[in-house]
């Protein structure tokens, strides 16, 4: 019996009853792309047939009855925000404080510190007032190092996650 060797990288899957499937990387990527294309075409077909994405006409309403939109937590007097004292890119939150509750008129914020064009860390929490939102400052540190601090605010529960 002649042994066939496969050159290059292969992905192999072991199935039940000792079956084994081997695929080259390009075939595996093709399977994934074909699957994604099928999902996109299915959504497009739904838009063409039903005129919208999401619910495909299964929700029946009576005449004069309107669909209620989702109620967010801030609609009842406040919203919940993620609180993190130190969040690093590719590592996530290192000093997690859990959550904080913003009062009505306050927002969730994410303060990003950028140095040399690279995001170093970010701080997440609740604002005290709207003057903290959407500002960008350039801080001059020792040895002529400049740090850019930008603040982004949002008003949905856990939107700064």
UniProtKB/Swiss-Prot annotation:
CDD domains hit by this protein: TFP_LU_ECD_C9orf57
Originating organism: Homo sapiens
Name of this protein: Uncharacterized protein C9orf57
Pfam families given in the database record: DUF4723 (PF15851)
Highest taxon of source: Eukaryota
Keywords, alphabetical: Membrane, Transmembrane, Transmembrane helix
Subcellular location, record wording: Membrane
Lineage summary: Eukaryota, Metazoa, Chordata, Craniata, Vertebrata
Keyword Chloroplast in annotation: no
InterPro entries on file: DUF4723 (IPR031710)
One Gene Ontology cellular component: membrane
């Amino acid at each position: 019996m002649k042994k066939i060797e496969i050159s290059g990288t292969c992905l192999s899957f072991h199935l039940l009853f000792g079956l084994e499937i081997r695929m080259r990387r390009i075939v595996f990527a093709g399977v994934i792309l074909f699957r994604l294309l099928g999902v996109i075409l299915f959504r497009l077909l739904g838009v063409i047939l039903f005129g919208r994405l999401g619910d495909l006409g299964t929700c029946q309403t009576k005449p004069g009855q309107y669909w209620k939109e989702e109620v967010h937590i801030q609609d009842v007097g406040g919203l919940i925000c993620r609180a993190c004292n130190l969040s690093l890119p590719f590592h996530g939150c290192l000093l997690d404080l859990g959550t904080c509750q913003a009062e009505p008129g306050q927002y969730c914020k994410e303060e990003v510190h950028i140095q040399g064009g690279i995001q170093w860390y970010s701080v997440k929490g609740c604002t005290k007032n709207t003057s903290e939102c959407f500002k960008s400052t350039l801080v001059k540190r020792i040895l002529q190092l400049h740090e850019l601090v930008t603040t982004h605010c949002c008003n949905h529960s856990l939107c700064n996650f």
